[in-house]
Amino acid sequence: VATPGGQVLEQATDTIARLTSRHPNRAIVINAQPSVSDAPLEAWVQAHCQIPGPGRPQVCGEQITIEARGAAVSQVPGTVLPLLVPDLPVIFWWPYGMPYDQPLFKRLSDLADRIIVDSATCETPERALVRLAELLGKPSEISDMVWARLTPWREMIAQFFDSPSMLPHLYSLQRIEVTYRNPTGDRSAALLLLGWLGSRLGWTLNGTLQRD
């Protein structure tokens, strides 16, 4: 997990602790602050253990936190590599912002089997989604948390047309309008839902996307 520290680091640690009960793991959490004055690279280890239910074994997870500032950020990939467990899949989670042009993301993503991002945290989701599409088919699998959060909506829409009486209406659709409301102004979910609907209907984009 690569974070800029602060609240994002705290949220990542909390998520890892809650995941441990279902998925024992070794989590490597990186607090990378390249714009801060140089300081020696520091690291520490902590354990996440859950109180087991009756008759169940206790499950614990291990978290290694690496703190890097300034030039020390360039040492992070070389520090992470020997900490990976052989023969286990490596999941690389970048929880905030658009990482694609950042050197740390490029180097760490080469070590991962799957990369997880959240396009809802990007200032320009259109650009973020285009870059995500460019990464598809690369050695690492790509997952967007916005796409995962859309799963109930996609299932509901698909179920609506499961009925034989409704299926003919699906292919008579000429126009779709998605109305969304988000206090933060994020529109990545709306864009992904539109893209999914268009791909299922075999539509192609004939114009340039413009924001009102």
Residue ranges and their predicted role:
Residues 38-43, 102, 127, 186-190, ...:
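Short, solvent-exposed polar/charged micro-motifs at secondary-structure junctions
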Residues 150-210:
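ATP/pyrophosphate-binding catalytic subdomain of soluble kinases
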